[in-house]
Amino acid sequence: MSEQSKCPVTGRTAGNPVAGGSMLNRDWWPNQLHLDMLHQHSSLVNPMGDEFRYKEEFRKLDLGAVKKDLYALMTDSQEWWPADYGHYGGLFIRMAWHSAGTYRTSDGRGGGGRGNQRFAPLNSWPDNANLDKARRLLWPIKQKYGKMLSWADLMILAGNCALESMGFKTFGFGGGRVDIWEPEEDIYWGKEVEWLGNNRYSGERDLENPLAAVQMGLIYVNPEGPDGNPDPVAAGRDIRETFARMAMNDEETVALVAGGHTFGKCHGVGDPNLIGPEPEAAGIEEQGLGWKSGYGSGKGDETMTSGLEGAWTPDPIHWDMGYLGMLFKYEWELTKSPAGAWQWKPKDVAEEDLAPAAHDPSKRVPTMMTTADLAMRMDPVYGPISRRYYEHPDQFADAFARAWFKLTHRDMGPKSRYLGAEVPAEDLIWQDPVPAVDHELIGEGEIAELKKRLLASGLPIPELVSTTWASASTFRGSDKRGGANGSRIRLAPQKDWEVNQPEQLQRVLEKLEEIRHAFNGEQSGGKRVSLADLIVLGGCAAVEEAARRAGNDVTIPFAPGRTDASQAETDVESFAVLEPLADGFRNYARQKYSVTPEEMLVDRSQLLTLTATEMTVLLGGLRVLGANFRQSPHGVFTKRHETLTNDFFVNLLDMGTEWKPVSKEHDTFEGRDRKTGEPRWSATRVDLIFGSNARLRAIAEVYGSDDAQEKFVQDFVAAWNKVMNLDRFEIS
């Protein structure tokens, strides 16, 4: 082969791709622990730089001007992708819905809060076909407002403006979504290796957790019915399961489906085999666009998207009762679209109930319903709700407005994070409200005094530390839920979670409440301490005392201002999903799972927004502080208990210890003296992974060195303080 045909850098020939042509570590060792998810979205991939603050930029934005531009865009049909019915509303509603609709409650991941629809795999999901065009239509507006308006906010705002421009009154809009700049590596979308694959069910039809869609590449359900079977009642069961996993109840589900399908149409007029590859697989000349269709012009009335064909209502660009009216007015018979997809047509449809052709208003064409739509009538629960909405249009409009707002804001966390003039004043239970501070906050003198009282209370260091960790570590960076603010650890359901050791927790909380009551009663002015603040302060005092015992004087920064939520402000069912299935930091697992304990530790660390270094130093410190579930000895590699030493790392790395499994599942281990055979320590996989995994061992070696004690304490305190304040959005 000639030298000209070889890459001058790598030596690869033209037949081998320069990028991705060699085996990666994960190709050689597919079971390797996936730590990269802990280092996503760093400043190295963010073109905005470390000093950029989106909140400050958004506050400069003229939101009214942006909305005016969006309203104008709705009817500014472009030749390269003409608007159905002369209005892009339906397209932008679908784009916003599919941006937000990937959210799932089980781990809080997905949703529209990061603008992730711009990246793989979402930008190439079959269910997102042709939404690339919607984003390209928005580019002139994004270009105009630049850094003041994120893609994430723009996509949701475009959906709102689409609804408003077609006559619907929305509930409001909150900005503040910060864009990411690379695909998310932490989200498990399923194990299937083909689009629309379905290997996620077991039993009769038990959907794998944490998934919230029935097939790979769909947002929720197959609109043709379960696995393409056009059974509306069976479709209702799938809809209920998937929407519930997105935090929607039955009434919200009906409102969303009926409200959203009041607008726009489906596209399936020709042979689906003529649709080209998705954006990530398309040629470079397509410039990031995909699904180029070879059917006719590939646009306008010859557009191919889902394979279904037709509008739901006779007037697809105005808010009315057309969807529910058609649903109940007619009987429906099964048919197939021109593309071969199962759908339903109304029997003996009246002339006035035909829809205009999307690009020729002189023509009238039949409307349609999908199998999923008919579930809104045929399902025994959805049916009566749909009928009530049909008979009470005001209830329907209010329910849809609220459900749409919830859909598009559910992953943003508490209302305090919302920005802009259109944030609704009403507090909603799903926003996990906490009361505003209504008292003077404690200062440095009171903080020092309270620490003394906490340490003199008789509560041991392990109980103070584990209670504080239990309160703060519920936080999820995915949907900004959980955390210590609100002191919900004293409320149902958290007070009863096994991992929180309810009997010990009750004892600790009673003592903390006693201290709080006495302190507040002594104050002559309006100064008070909340239980939420005192819970965190107790753990901080315990960590500082443990560090002093190790010879290190440290003061953990403490910012008061947390308040105490009530049980009425706490949705028990909604908070139940925050219960840890496993918490490696406390060496806890509720049961054995198909994934390894160390994988669950990394997953939990990612939700806590920890780096691998922070995860490592926190776990090593919590072990010697005695924070294990039920005081388990596993991983407590120290003889100096309740002392913040680097002993965990020193003893983990000691080659004088030989480890062997003591359970057939290889999840618990015993470490014996390599020479004498005497037992030294016991451990779980979560403990030993820090000596086994090469990357984690490298970090452990830093903290296990002879000169590492001071650095270990400093790094532990920094990571601890980070977790304590993850939900303090007002100070972050």
From Swiss-Prot:
Stored InterPro entries: Catalase_peroxidase, Haem_peroxidase, Haem_peroxidase_sf, Peroxidases_AS, Peroxidases_heam-ligand_BS
Keyword Thylakoid part of the UniProt annotation: no
Cofactor(s) in the UniProt record: heme b
Annotated GO CC locations: cytosol
The entry's keywords: Heme, Hydrogen peroxide, Iron, Metal-binding, Oxidoreductase, Peroxidase
GO biological processes: cellular response to hydrogen peroxide; hydrogen peroxide catabolic process
Reactions accelerated catalytically: H2O2 + AH2 = A + 2 H2O; 2 H2O2 = O2 + 2 H2O
PROSITE patterns in UniProt: PEROXIDASE_1 (PS00435), PEROXIDASE_2 (PS00436), PEROXIDASE_4 (PS50873)
Single Gene Ontology MF annotation: catalase activity
PTM annotation: Formation of the three residue Trp-Tyr-Met cross-link is important for the catalase, but not the peroxidase activity of the enzyme.
Subunit and partners: Homodimer or homotetramer.
Function per UniProt: Bifunctional enzyme with both catalase and broad-spectrum peroxidase activity.
PANTHER family given in the database record: CATALASE-PEROXIDASE (PTHR30555:SF0), HYDROPEROXIDASE I, BIFUNCTIONAL CATALASE-PEROXIDASE (PTHR30555)
Protein name per Swiss-Prot or TrEMBL: Catalase-peroxidase
